[in-house]
């Protein structure tokens, strides 16, 4: 398996040439990222088949794919689902039930982290989708800045400083005093306010759950803004990405980066909150100038974000081949061990994690064993709080926190508007101020 990905890369070129000749693919896979392309390359080489990967951007994924799944017209053989809508999709008649003959994936259950396997089940306990990943989060930080300002870059020591919200504020003050900013924007603190009292957005009585911990996000975000603890570089903006490489202009917002900006207007970001996949798809892709100057540690509370589940379409004409693909991706020990070595992806598949965790290291993190850290964080994940409303209600909440922080509304007005927006989107949900 050591050379398998290299061989597959050559095979993918050959497969591409074959695809150009108009030959119909043996299998069609639809996803929202290109992370499966390397998997497909290996699968094509192993089984001498062609696989067509269709990528739909995340923001359009559900609205584009759902009509095909419901009508059957143009539906893929295999498709992925993200955690934010997974709870909805496992209850729909889209994915084939995998906990039945001839698949019997229920026999795999003990090989996985409990929460990962459980999330792929519907309310009747049928397995509809499976995953190879676990996605706990942490705080990635710059080692050189940590040494300069805090006197150490040791992840355990920095984790102690980050272990409470008050500790985060203290470090933020020290960073600002040295012309650094703790985070790019206030979004990096939300996982830790939510984590103080983890609750589902909607409970079993169909009531919106607004906890004191969630309300505290308004206050912490406003304090971070007022005290200038962040660089005001919104998540996913050009300035946000650039902040991982070095100094950026303070309060750049969504504007493009200009090379001739004055140094006197600049600051440098110390850290950012990201889940496991953020290391590979964000930092390694965009922090090329600071590679090797990073480490990862805990925040005030554990959290997780994202994750990809995969299953086959219930009416696929290629179910045998589709299952072989799924089995290789999530339950082939040799493949997954090689996958970890090639990508650093943190697995939920225990036979491989037990093998690799002891001596794992990542050059980008100056040799840190982030694998062991994330596996320990994964043990703290409480997936019972996940609901099918998380993405939409979370977005509405974030919008109103932003309006308050920017001075567009009072806190009370923002909360009231949030309740109104939830009620408009989901009339059946009872909101706290409902009479």
Tell me what each language-model feature is.
Residues 32-52, 397:
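Short, polar/charged alpha-helical segment
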Residues 95, 280, 304, 308-391, ...:
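Mature extracytoplasmic/periplasmic domains
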Residues 82-138, 147, 166, 291-298, ...:
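Hinge/lid segment of periplasmic solute-binding proteins
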Residues 102-105, 121-189, 200-235, 314-320, ...:
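Helix-loop-helix "hinge/cap" segment bordering the ligand-binding cleft or interdomain interface
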């Amino acid at each position: 398996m050591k050379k398998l990905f290299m061989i597959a890369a050559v095979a993918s070129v050959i497969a591409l040439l074959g695809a150009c000749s108009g030959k119909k693919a043996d299998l069609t896979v639809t996803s929202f990222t290109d992370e499966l392309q390397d998997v497909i390359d290996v699968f094509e080489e192993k089984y001498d088949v062609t696989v067509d990967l269709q990528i739909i951007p995340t923001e359009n994924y559900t609205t584009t794919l759902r009509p095909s799944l419901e009508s059957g017209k143009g539906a893929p053989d295999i498709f992925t689902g993200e955690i934010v809508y997974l709870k909805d999709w496992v209850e729909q008649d889209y994915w084939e039930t995998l906990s039945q003959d001839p698949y019997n994936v229920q026999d795999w259950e003990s090989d996985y982290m409990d929460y990962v396997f459980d999330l792929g089940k519907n309310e009747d306990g049928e397995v509809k989708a499976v995953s190879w990943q676990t996605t706990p989060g942490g705080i990635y930080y710059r080692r050189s800045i940590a040494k300069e300002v805090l006197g150490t870059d040791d992840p355990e020591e920095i984790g102690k400083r980050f272990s409470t919200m008050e500790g985060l504020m203290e470090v933020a003050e020290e960073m600002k005093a040295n012309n650094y900013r703790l985070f790019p924007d206030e979004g990096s603190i939300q996982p830790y306010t939510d984590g103080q009292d983890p609750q589902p957005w909607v409970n079993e009585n169909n009531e919106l759950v607004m906890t004191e911990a969630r309300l505290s996000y308004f206050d912490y975000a406003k304090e971070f803004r007022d005290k200038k603890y962040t660089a005001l570089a919104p998540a996913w903006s050009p300035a946000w990405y650039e902040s991982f490489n070095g100094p950026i202009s303070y309060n750049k917002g969504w504007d493009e980066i200009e090379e001739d900006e004055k140094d006197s207007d600049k600051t440098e970001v110390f850290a950012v909150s990201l889940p496991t996949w953020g290391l590979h798809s964000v930092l390694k892709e965009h922090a090329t100038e600071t590679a090797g100057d990073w480490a990862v540690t805990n925040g005030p509370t554990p959290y997780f974000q994202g994750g990809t589940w995969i299953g086959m379409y219930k009416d696929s004409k290629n179910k045998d081949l589709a299952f072989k693909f799924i089995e290789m991706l999530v339950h082939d020990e040799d493949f997954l061990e090689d996958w970890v070595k090639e990508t650093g992806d943190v697995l939920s598949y225990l036979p491989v994690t037990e093998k690799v965790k002891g001596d794992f290291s990542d050059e980008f993190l100056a040799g840190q064993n982030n694998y062991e850290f994330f596996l320990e964080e994964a043990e703290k994940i409480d997936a019972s709080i996940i609901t099918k409303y998380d993405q939409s209600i979370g977005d509405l909440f974030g919008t109103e926190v932003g309006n308050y922080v920017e001075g567009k509304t009072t806190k009370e007005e923002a909360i009231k508007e949030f309740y109104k927006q939830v009620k408009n989107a989901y009339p059946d949900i009872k909101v706290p101020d409902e009479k």
